[in-house]
Amino acid sequence: MGSAPVIVRRAEVTDAPALSALGAATFRETFDDSNTPEDMARYVAEAFFPEQQAADIVDPRSVMLVAEHREPTGATALIGYAQIRSGDVPAEVPGANPLELKRLYVLRAWHGKGVAQDLMNTCLTIARARGCDTLWLGVWEHNTRAQTFYRKYGFVRVGQHDFVLGTDVQTDWLMARAMSDG
């Protein structure tokens, strides 16, 4: 992991199988301890299959980014990803042209190494280039690590909504940041 380079790039359709595995792995690392095995299995099966990832990659309303680690041998592995997209916006989210930060996950082994920051900074650059005035997201009310990370980037809580994981209805905080804030 040390000094080998990590690059952030736009995902390609050929990344879909690896992105599917990464999405499932990072979601499980983050939420397995807080949900039933049945609910996790159902959600992961519905959200992280290769065809869904491929559809998200080619969707013109979406930008899917991957963080790729390159070993000195030339071998590569996906270690994180992020997705921003336009679409339905909750009423609590301000702005005339908001974008959603749909997902931002990094493998636990890479936490604290700047990968999440690189992904977030790339998302902010893309959002600005698209004329976005507000970037918003939903984060589980009990995911304090993620909430702290988002606050460092100027996100504030603007509301909440339900997130259904299997049979469990959970509360996500809606957080947003004005893009004029730098």
Predicted regions and their residues:
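Charged catalytic carboxylate motif
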Residues: 18, 118, 145
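C-terminal "cap" of GNAT-fold acetyltransferases
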Residues: 65, 95-99, 133-147, 151-182
